[in-house]
Amino acid sequence: MSEPASISTGIAARYATAMFELAEEAKALPALEKDVDALDAALSESADLRDLIHSPIYGRDEASAAIGGVADAMKLQDMTGNTLRLMASKRRLFVLPALLSELRERIADHKGEVTAEVTSAKALTKTQLDKLTKSLKAQVGKTVTVKETVDENIIGGLIVKIGSKMIDTSVRSKLNALQNTMKEVG
């Protein structure tokens, strides 16, 4: 992991810990989850918001006022709006995507949920998704949400990622392994 990424991750983790603990104490985790979803959607949809959090041309006061206006317009919780203003005043808005990811993980963990990123060569049927979800739930002991991606380059099979664990049963990886074995022999 590169140095700037690890610094960003550390900063995001500290903010996420503070926000999560405050929301948990106030029994406001569902509201925090709504704020996370809303901010995530806003970041995906608004180039101006992405520019605001990444561009160094905005001063502390400008960024704080702008992000405060965004928080007010989105009707975010006071805690979320205040955190965003604090991040702007400390020039830390660039960690917002990592903060949202960290908060999403903490909320899911608190609810006993985990997200599995599943890559397949073609879209899985409803039956296949149900079987996979049941199998993964039995393995991890938590409720599993499947985030499906289609990548024809894997030829067949699946790549399943849950947290830091990955199971790669794709035909592409098996062909690559066979190719490496053949290189070693010849």
Swiss-Prot record:
Keyword entries, A-Z: ATP synthesis, Cell inner membrane, Cell membrane, CF(1), Hydrogen ion transport, Ion transport, Membrane, Transport
Protein name per the record: ATP synthase subunit delta
Membrane topology category: Peripheral membrane protein
InterPro entries: ATP_synth_OSCP/delta_N_sf (IPR026015), ATPase_OSCP/d_CS (IPR020781), ATPase_OSCP/dsu (IPR000711)
Role description: F(1)F(0) ATP synthase produces ATP from ADP in the presence of a proton or sodium gradient. F-type ATPases consist of two structural domains, F(1) containing the extramembraneous catalytic core and F(0) containing the membrane proton channel, linked together by a central stalk and a peripheral stalk. During catalysis, ATP synthesis in the catalytic domain of F(1) is coupled via a rotary mechanism of the central stalk subunits to proton translocation.
UniProt GO MF annotations: proton-transporting ATP synthase activity, rotational mechanism
SUPFAM superfamilies per record: N-terminal domain of the delta subunit of the F1F0-ATP synthase
A GO cellular-component term linked to this record: proton-transporting ATP synthase complex
Localization terms from the record: Cell inner membrane
Protein family per UniProt: Belongs to the ATPase delta chain family.
Originating species: Jannaschia sp. (strain CCS1)
Xref: PROSITE patterns: ATPASE_DELTA (PS00389)
Subunit structure: F-type ATPases have 2 components, F(1) - the catalytic core - and F(0) - the membrane proton channel. F(1) has five subunits: alpha(3), beta(3), gamma(1), delta(1), epsilon(1). CF(0) has four main subunits: a(1), b(1), b'(1) and c(10-14). The alpha and beta chains form an alternating ring which encloses part of the gamma chain. F(1) is attached to F(0) by a central stalk formed by the gamma and epsilon chains, while a peripheral stalk is formed by the delta, b and b' chains.
Signal sequence segment: none
Gene: atpH
Transmembrane segments: none
Top-rank taxon, per record: Bacteria
Pfam families listed in its UniProt record: OSCP
